[in-house]
Curated annotation (Swiss-Prot):
Entry annotated with the keyword Ligase: yes
Catalytic activity: 5-amino-1-(5-phospho-D-ribosyl)imidazole-4-carboxylate + L-aspartate + ATP = (2S)-2-[5-amino-1-(5-phospho-beta-D-ribosyl)imidazole-4-carboxamido]succinate + ADP + phosphate + 2 H(+)
Species this chain originates from: Shewanella amazonensis (strain ATCC BAA-1098 / SB2B)
Name used for this protein in its record: Phosphoribosylaminoimidazole-succinocarboxamide synthase
Taxonomic path: Bacteria, Pseudomonadati, Pseudomonadota, Gammaproteobacteria, Alteromonadales
Pathway entry: Purine metabolism; IMP biosynthesis via de novo pathway; 5-amino-1-(5-phospho-D-ribosyl)imidazole-4-carboxamide from 5-amino-1-(5-phospho-D-ribosyl)imidazole-4-carboxylate: step 1/2
Biological processes, Gene Ontology terms: 'de novo' IMP biosynthetic process
NCBIfam families the UniProt entry points to: PRK13960.1 (NF010567), purC_vibrio (TIGR02735)
């Protein structure tokens, strides 16, 4: 097996039966099943959802994105070996722990393969639910320049880089481009305050104003569950991003759930505890890859300056990264996944062929 073959780089060309366009994100692709296949799987598999619930196959890839671009490595390596399986394994573990702790459900109904989730259709909240326990990254850069108010919250004077904050901070941003909301610019990923959400809760996708309290409660509780579990592994949960949505349960009631992925190296910063106590930062998340890129390219402003996006896209397209850098990221992702789950992340010889075989033979979703 070649290293490039073990990587699932293209995940939007699987022959899964669907009558809708495949939705391709930076890392995952979503295949909406036909009404007939959704109803059949709900019946055959006994999923605890209404009989007419639309289902989708969500396939993760091994692609790596940073600064809104997809990067690749030498030897035609179009992703990070083990990354997709590691991300799904970590999310599956945390979602299970949330359930054990009486928190909300997720959108996942079934896990046919390490790269694949069967999910129910959700109505997403249009908020990137970001929560921070330490001041670092973009927040520290802004604080250093004199900013003190973040998403309507005023931070005290005298904070130091990478310091633990006095309390958990919720610093939401917009998910997608939202139009017609007073005071909220019509662009992706804009910081917003709780007051913005309260004044326009329906525009942000909340069904009831009281659900803003519930989303914040689930955000803090989910963060707490992961933070406590990581602390036992001597890992520091620094900050993370959650996503939420509504689904209809088997009784026809609407309920708020966790969506997408949670507590992964892609959506979070995780630091090594021993190094942090020693005054050093050792990243066990994608932040390490971002820092590598900022040091690797001679003009890091291209990666940070939103006005230089065409140059950034060319940089990612035209530069194959060193193999050892790609494998360092692989070790970070598989290492933290194995710590969290207590199980080895196995590299597949040919993940695409495995996925097709399972979905054909066990789920009858491939003609």
């Amino acid at each position: 097996m070649s290293l490039a073959d073990s990587v699932l780089a293209v995940n939007n060309d699987l022959p899964i039966r669907t009558d809708k366009p495949v939705h391709s994100g930076k890392v995952r692709s979503v295949y909406w099943l036909t009404e007939a296949d959704s109803a059949r799987l709900i019946r055959e598999r006994g999923y605890d959802v209404p009989a007419d619930t639309p289902l989708a196959i969500m396939v993760i890839s091994d692609r790596i994105s940073a600064f809104d671009c997809i990067f690749h490595g030498e030897g035609d390596l179009r992703g990070i070996p083990g990354k997709g399986a590691a991300l799904n394994a970590i999310s599956n573990h945390w979602f299970g722990l949330f359930k054990e702790n009486g928190l909300a459900d997720s959108h996942i109904l079934d896990i046919p393969h390490p790269f694949v989730w069967i999910v129910q259709k959700a109505r997403p909240i249009k908020v990137e639910a970001i929560i921070r326990q330490y001041i670092t990254g973009s927040m520290w850069r802004a604080y250093q320049k004199g900013e003190r108010v973040f998403c309507g919250i005023t931070l005290p004077e005298g904070l130091q880089k990478d310091q633990k904050l006095p309390e958990l901070l919720i610093t939401p941003s917009t998910k997608g481009i939202l139009t017609g909301i007073p005071g909220v610019p019509e662009q992706d990923d804009v910081n917003i305050s709780r007051a913005d959400i309260e004044a326009n809760f329906e525009a942000f996708g909340f069904e009831k104003k009281e659900d803003i309290d519930l989303y914040e409660k689930l955000l803090k509780e989910g963060f707490g569950v992961i933070s406590e579990a990581l602390a036992k592994l001597d890992q520091v949960f620094v900050d993370t991003k959650f996503e939420f949505g509504y689904v209809t349960d088997s009784n026809g009631n609407s309920k708020l759930i966790y969506m997408d992925e949670v507590g992964t190296p892609d959506s979070s910063r995780i630091w090594d505890g021993a190094a942090y106590r020693d005054g050093k930062i050792v990243e066990n998340s994608k932040e390490g890859f971002r820092q590598f890129l900022l040091n690797h390219f001679p003009d890091p402003d291209i990666l940070l300056n939103k006005d230089r996006m065409p140059e950034r896209e060319a940089l990612a397209r035209d530069n194959a990264l060193p193999l050892d850098a790609m494998m360092n990221v692989s070790r970070t992702y598989t290492g933290i996944a194995e710590k969290v789950t207590g199980r080895k992340i196995e590299l597949s010889d040919n993940p695409k062929a495995e996925i097709i075989a399972i979905l054909k033979e066990q789920y009858a979703l491939v003609d």
